[in-house]
Curated annotation (Swiss-Prot):
Function: Transcription coactivator that associates with the serum response factor (srf) transcription factor to control expression of genes regulating the cytoskeleton during development, morphogenesis and cell migration. The srf-mrtfa complex activity responds to Rho GTPase-induced changes in cellular globular actin (G-actin) concentration, thereby coupling cytoskeletal gene expression to cytoskeletal dynamics. Mrtfa binds G-actin via its RPEL repeats, regulating activity of the mrtfa-srf complex. Activity is also regulated by filamentous actin (F-actin) in the nucleus.
Coiled coil location: 497-542
Annotated GO CC locations: cytoplasm; nucleus
Record field: compositional bias (Pro residues): 712-725
Identification of the protein by name: Myocardin-related transcription factor A
Domains: entry comment: The N-terminal region is required for nuclear localization and the C-terminal region mediates transcriptional activity.
Chain intervals with Polar residues compositional bias: 160-170, 729-738
Motif Bipartite Nuclear localization signal per UniProt: ranges: 62-100
Amino acid sequence: MTLLDTEQALLAIHTVLQLKLQQRRTREELENQGIMPPLKSPAAFHEQRRSLERARTEDYLKRKIRSRPERAELVRMHILEETSAEPSLQAKQIKLKRARLADDLNEKISQRPGPMELVVKNILPVETSLKEVIIDVDYPEVVDNSSFDEDSSDALSPEQPASQESQGSIPSPIENRPSETTQIPALSPSHAFSCVQFGTDAFNQDSLQSTAITISNGLTASICKSLPALVKQSQPKPSFEKSQRIKKPKEPKPKVKKLKYHQYIPPDQKQKGTPAMDSSYAKLLQQQQLFLQLQIINQQQHQHYNYQTILPAPPKPLPDQQNTNSSSTTTVRSMSTVAPSTLATPTITRQNSNVAVGGRTGPLPHNLDEMKVAELKLELKHRGLPVSGTKIDLIERLKASQDPSTATAASAKPTPVQQAKPPEVVPIVSSSCLTTREPIKLCSTSSTPPGSPCPSEVSVVSMDEVSMISDALGETVACPVTQQVQQNPAAEKSPPDARDKDLMLREKDRQIEELTQRLKQKQELVERLRQQLEQEKRTPQHSTDDQQALILAVKQEPLPLTVDSINKKASSIVKQELNTAIICQQEPQLLIGPVSSGIEGKVDNSAGTKLVFTLTNPSSQLPEENRQIVLQKVPTPPSSLHPNNSLPKQEVLLSCCALQNQKPALQLVPGTVLSLSSSNLQPMLNMNGFQKWHGEALDSLQKQLVHNESPATPPQQPEPEPPPHSIFLTHSSPQWSKNPPGYDEAMKQQPNSCEDGRPGCLQAVDFFDVLIKNLDIPSEFKDYLVPCLKQTSPSHQAAQMVPQVEMAPPPSPIHSALGRLEDFLESSTGTPLLRGHQDGPSSMPLIDDLHSQMLSSLAILDHPPSPMDTSDLHFSPIGNSLGLDISEPPLDGMDWLELSEPPAMNLTPLSTFTPSVFSTDFLDSHDLHLHWDSCL
């Protein structure tokens, strides 16, 4: 803004102020008007102010007079009297007053609301009995004033005078209601019961038009008086009545607000002065309240059912009552020989039902303090006691009313009412079924506890209430009643589940007992086999015809049998036959025996090193010519043995038998060595194939597993890194490249490498000499299975490729992935491996009970030259099987038959699949400890 603009603005303001000063009144004018006090004579100033006020008042009156209506208008408005009026002043005043009131009343009547609005606003009071007769609807609270005319607001009861001038003589609705409600409790219950009319003939509709009708609390109200004349009264009276009625209706509203949404008060306990509502809204509200009552009744039934099971049994009932309870779980009760006539009216509620049935009461629940107020009131209603007061008063009233004498009498009350014949179920669907002339039978779907012959009162009373509710609701409330009837079957289905559980437990106990019996039988069989081993040890050169098995025994040991591991998993084994595992203490032992089904293995390390290996038995038959075993001469990976190793005493059992109708052939291509050492092993492996990694893969897996399991124990002698080799245990058709060599030729080809004179090596050599001599096994088999016979350089071993081992499958496609070492042995010798119990279900005594617990693991290893080196074995299943990584801490090199107890090592599952024959759910990975000790 520039300086020029500022000057222009100031100039404009100056001009405005100058104009205002020119138009300002002088001081004299201000003094004359009383705005400013005069400078002189203050007394004159005050007098002047009074004169100004008088002048102002006069001016106001003059304006009013100028604006007043004409005389004719005042006469028309009855403010001024007419010139022809009576000379008496009192008569004129009365006439003017009446005319004025009449005009006011006519104007209000022309603008008055309709009758429904008057009822909603509680301006038009109507008695309950009058409503039932005039309206004739199903709900006592519903008010339908469509039959009223516009003059019904001025209706007076017959006791009231027709013309009343003063306000005090007009009885208000509030004054009428207490007089009606206070007369009802004055009657005794016996009088109230006598007033209720029973009989089937009272169901007709004519009872609604009778002079004596039943109101909501079961009492009869005489309405012999004629209906009040609904005529318009004289004009002076209604203004006072109107003014009083406009002021009074606000008083009863707080009584309605005291009701809570979860408290249901039946119509017989509601005051008649409750404000009426619209018919449609009242119907909805009534239905909601009745549905809420149904829910409360259902809760009370279930709670009372639970309490009844704890309370002592009531006195012994009649014989017919016992017959009724034994014939059906539903208790059928007949209210009386005739149905109550008041069921046709919708106002009958649980109070009438209790009176009709006989005031049934029952034992109190124990936890009264935990019950809700509504539940306590319901118990009080069942006993006919008042329900008013606080919760403590209700509890004390219930405790005072329930003593042993009353409890006994109350429990014996319903017995005369109950029927002795088989129950008839009459479903209550709507009020139409109650209009028959037959006795009404109510079925209680909430059955009493089995131990209590006396039925539950709450169930019967609640069904009586349901019948009343269905009478009030009609077909609309039929669904909740049927739902209540259908609730109990769901509760009755729970006992079969418990029975099924008991049956399952008993079945499992029976299975455990059977397994224990079979375990004992197999223990006897193992003892017999041990004796045979001892005999064969003393006479190892007998002919094949006299021998039952080939035995090489070094030490005699007891063969205890453990059942704990079988019992641990017996609950998860349902349809699999189990065979026991042979568990040896003190010294390590290896047993390879026949199996009836499945692949199993078990090791228990509680007392000593124990290991059991089995391979599955093919379920097919092979021709006789396939029973021979031919080993081919192929290059084998050499191994270096520690010269100072000494083999401990061991007992190795290799038995052969030919199973019935099963003659499988097993093809073994030599070039690998089985190296097994026992540990805490309980796996189940599907021996579809093995894969071993050497070189880089071996080192990486070895370092990873050693780091995970025992980080403080690294491999002491790492091996060189040759290219990785793999060994697969596969199945192929029985094809051989050449005929097996003779015994003499095999003995010539056998290297003589037992110069160290170790006892373990000599025992192995002697053992395989016996095998070769009696079973016609080529001598190459001893080269590949006895590592002490060959010693080569580590570099030669690293450079050699590992050949394959093939196991010929049987023709059966189901078990084609399974091979057994026992089949290999029994197909070679034709003699049974185990004697006894072959005809029964436990003829395979070593395997059947181990199918769900473990599976033998055959390690086809090409071990590195260093005896301190660790080896990893990776199982690569061909089908759906379990892959495992097995790592081993540094151990001393020993023979392949040596079983030792080195530090524990872990068997970690790489992946979990569902096996083709068994389930991997039985695997316990934390128990899979496997020791592999091979030295080639």
